Amino acid sequence: MWGSYTKVSLIESQEPIALSRPVVPPKPNTSALRRVLRRARDGFALNIDEAVVAMTARGEDLADLCASAARVRDVGLETAGRRGADGRLPITYSRKVFIPVTHLCRDSCHYCTFVTAPDMLRTQGAGMYLEPNEILNLARRGSELGCKEALFTLGDRPEDRWAQARDWLAERGYDSTLSYLRAMAIRVLEETGLLPHLNPGVMSWSELSRLKPVAPSMGMMLETTSRRLFETKGLAHYGSLDKDPTVRLRVLTDAGRLSIPFTTGLLVGIGETLAERADTLHEIRKSNKEFGHVQEVIVQNFRAKEHTAMAAVPDARIEDYLATVAVARLVLGPAMRIQAPPNLVSREECLALVTAGVDDWGGVSPLTPDHVNPERPWPALHELAAVTAEAGYTLVQRLTAQPKYVQAGAAWIDPRVRGHVVALADPVTGLARDVNPVGMPWQEPDDVESAGRMDINTAIDTEGRNTEARSDLDSAFGDWESIRAHVHELADCAPERIDTDVLAALRSAERDPAGCTDDEYLALATADGPALEAVTALADSLRRDVVGDDVTFVVNRNINFTNICYTGCRFCAFAQRKGDTDAYSLSREEVAERAWEAHVQGATEVCMQGGIDPELPVTGYVDLVRAVKTRVPSMHVHAFSPMEIANGVAKSGFSIREWLISLREAGLDTIPGTAAEILDDEVRWVLTKGKLPTSMWIEIVTTAHEVGLRSSSTMMYGHVDGPRHWVAHLQVLRDIQDRTGGFTEFVPLPFVHQNSPLYLAGAARPGPTHRDNRAVHALARIMLHGRISHIQTSWVKLGVERTQAMLNGGANDLGGTLMEETISRMAGSEYGSAKTVAELIAIAEGIGRTARQRTTTYALRGA
C-alpha cells in the first residue's frame, strides 16, 4: 500500500457467495510453453491458444515472457518518437480529478463497492447525484493542482431502476443521466478548462455521438467476454444487464465507428478462465484493428472488497497478473498503450509491472480518491515518478486523449473541444503542457465561409477530379483486411436461383403483388432470362395501373454545400478531408445565390445535402434553410439526409423531434431519404465506418413524417449486398409507410464504383449488372404496390438507354434536372451532372411516353 484514505462505505451488505478461486492456472505443458516463449522472444503476436499457454508461465519462464513483452513495449515507444525530458523512454499518466456523478446504477455486480442504493445515500447525507456546484468545485480544485482530466464515473442508467433518480433528474430539467452528464461536461470545460473523460457505461451509437462533442475521450471496461460469468447464477456478472459481453463489444465497436478515442480493458481474477481472458484480449485487438480507436487497454487486477458478494474471493495473484499484462502486450502489440492502476499493487509490484510491458499508469489524482477502489489510495506523484525512474523510465504527464489522437485533429477530436485540448497539449509531442487549465467557451465554430474548389459543380464535367482519392485514404476507413473478411461472410449467404421457384413466385405476385412471402420476393429478385422478362413485364403493368403512362420529373437544383467529411463511408468518393485539393465548402450566401439562379431557370426545388463537416456550426443547417427561403420564398427546400439530421441532433443536444421541428419552422419542406444505403446493419457496417445505424435511420425518418416532413426513400445496391438484402430493405420501407404514409417515392441507386474506396480496396463488386438494375426496379414496384406509387430511376447513374429500360420495367419518374451533381460524378459516373427539360422529355418520348413536370410531392405542374 502507498498510503491510506478514510473509507466511507455507501453500500449495503450483500450475502456472500461461494466462488472458487478466480483462475486456477492449468499445469503448463512444458514443450508448448517453450515454443510460445520462443515465439514471444522473436516478436510474434500470440494467438488465443498461445496466449493461454503463455499465461501459465511462472518463475524463470515468467521472467522470460516479461522480458519479451518489455522489448515490444520499448520498440513501440521508440517508433512513436517518445522520450522524456531526460532522454529516457516515458511511462505516461494523466493527472485527474475523479468525479463520481452518481453512485446509483441499474446493475448489481458482485464485486462492486461503488454502487449503492437511494436509502443508503440518504443515510450518508448524500444526494442521488452530485449537484452542479459540487462537480464544479471538484474540477476547480483539480485545476488549481494542475490536473488536466475530469474523469466522470457513474453507474449505468440509474433512472431505469430507481424512481428517486428519475425524480432528481426531472426536478432539474433533465430527461436522463446522460443528458445531465453532457451538461456537466460542458460546464467543466467552460468554467475550469479540465478535459472530460466520460465513463457512463453502456451507450448506444446515438448516445455516443451526442457525447463526442463534449469530451476528447471516453471509456468503458470490456472486463471479460465470458458469457459464463454473465449467465451463471452466483458468478460475477449474473443479473447485471449491462455486463452482457455482446452488448459491451457493440459499444466498443460503435465507439470505433464514431472515431472516439476510447479506453477499455479487462479485469483479472473475477472468475474467468485463461481461455476467456485470452479471448477478451483478442476481441479488443480485433476491434482496434478494424477502427484504430482503442487508445489504451487497462489490465486491472481484482481486489476483493468488504460487504460484497465476492468479499471472500482471493485477490488476483501477482504472478498471474504479471503474466496477463505481458500477454496483453504481446497480443496487442507495440503501438498499444498498456495501462495498470498503480494504487492496486505495492511499490515493488509496480516495478514488476514495468518489466512486464506496462507503459501507462492511467489517471492519478492528487485530490480525489479512487472511488471505485476507495480502500486503495493513489500513490503520491513524486513516489510514482521515483518508482518509474527506478525501473529505468521517466514519468510524463499526458492528456486524457493519447498523443496520436490529439495530433490527428478533427478526425478524432470534435472542434468544440479542440480548443480546450490545444490549450493543454504540447504542440510537438501531443503530451500535456506544464500549465494549469483555464475555462474557455464551449462554442460552435465560426460560420462557414466559401472555400476550396467551389467550381467543382461545373468543373467536374470538364476537368474532373484533381486527385484520385482523399489524402487520408489509408487511415480514414478502418482496416481493409477486416472489411474484406466481413464481405466474404456476406457472400457466403448468397441465395441460389431456381427457375421453378421464380415461376411460382411470379404467379403469386400476379395474384397479390404486395402479399408474397419473403422467399417469393427473393425468387423474383434472382430472376434472369425469360423469367426476368416476365417479372419486369408484371412490374410495368402495375406501374401502368397505378400511375399511368406519364413519365414525371421535377425542375430542381442539387446544392451539395460541402464535401468535407470524416464519417468514413467506404463506398463514398465524394467526401474529402479539409485541405484536399478537391475539398470545398459553400457559405450560406453562396447557397442562397445558387438557389436564386435555379429559380430564375425555372426550378421549383433545391435539394441540399453535404458532408458531415465537424466544423459546421450546429446552427448551420437551420441557417442554410433560412438563407434559401429568404432569397427565394417560394422555393421548395428538400434537404438534409437522416445522417445530417443525426449530426445536428448530436451537436445540439436536442431530441430528434425537437431538431426536426426547428428545421421545419425555419422553412424545411421535405427531407431526402438518403443515407439508407442498405437498411441491414451487417451490410451497413461494411459500407460505412461511422454512419448512423439502421434503427436510428428508421427513428429519424418516422419522426420526420410524424412532424409533417415527408421524405423520399432510397436504396443503394450493387456493392457487397445481395437479393436477400434488397427484400429486407424494402420490407423495412413498407413497414414505415404502413405506420406513417410519409414516403413520396422510392429511388433505387446503383452503386457507382470507379473511384469508390471500397471498390479500390478490392472489397466491392464493380456496381450492379444490368440484370440487377432491372430486377431491383421491378421488385420495388411489386413489393411497394399499394404503398408507394412512384418509383424513380437515376439517369445520372444509369445513362439514357438504361434509364429507358427501367421506365419499361416498373419506374415512372426521372428525378430532376439537377443542374449540378457532384456525388455520382466524383465517384466516376460518366453521364453528366445536368439535364435540360427538353432532354428529359426526349428520354420519355424515346420510349413512346409523355413527360410531365411535377412538384417535389408529385403534384403535376400546369394540370
UniProtKB/Swiss-Prot annotation:
A Pfam family reported for this protein in Swiss-Prot or TrEMBL: Radical_SAM
Catalytic activity: 5-amino-6-(D-ribitylamino)uracil + L-tyrosine + S-adenosyl-L-methionine = 5-amino-5-(4-hydroxybenzyl)-6-(D-ribitylimino)-5,6-dihydrouracil + 2-iminoacetate + 5'-deoxyadenosine + L-methionine + H(+); 5-amino-5-(4-hydroxybenzyl)-6-(D-ribitylimino)-5,6-dihydrouracil + S-adenosyl-L-methionine = 7,8-didemethyl-8-hydroxy-5-deazariboflavin + 5'-deoxyadenosine + L-methionine + NH4(+) + H(+)
Annotated ranges, domain Radical SAM core: 91-343, 551-792
Cofactor: how and how many bound: Binds 2 [4Fe-4S] clusters. The clusters are coordinated with 3 cysteines and an exchangeable S-adenosyl-L-methionine.
Pathway assigned in UniProt: Cofactor biosynthesis; coenzyme F0 biosynthesis
Function: Catalyzes the radical-mediated synthesis of 7,8-didemethyl-8-hydroxy-5-deazariboflavin (FO) from 5-amino-6-(D-ribitylamino)uracil and L-tyrosine.
Protein's name in the database: FO synthase
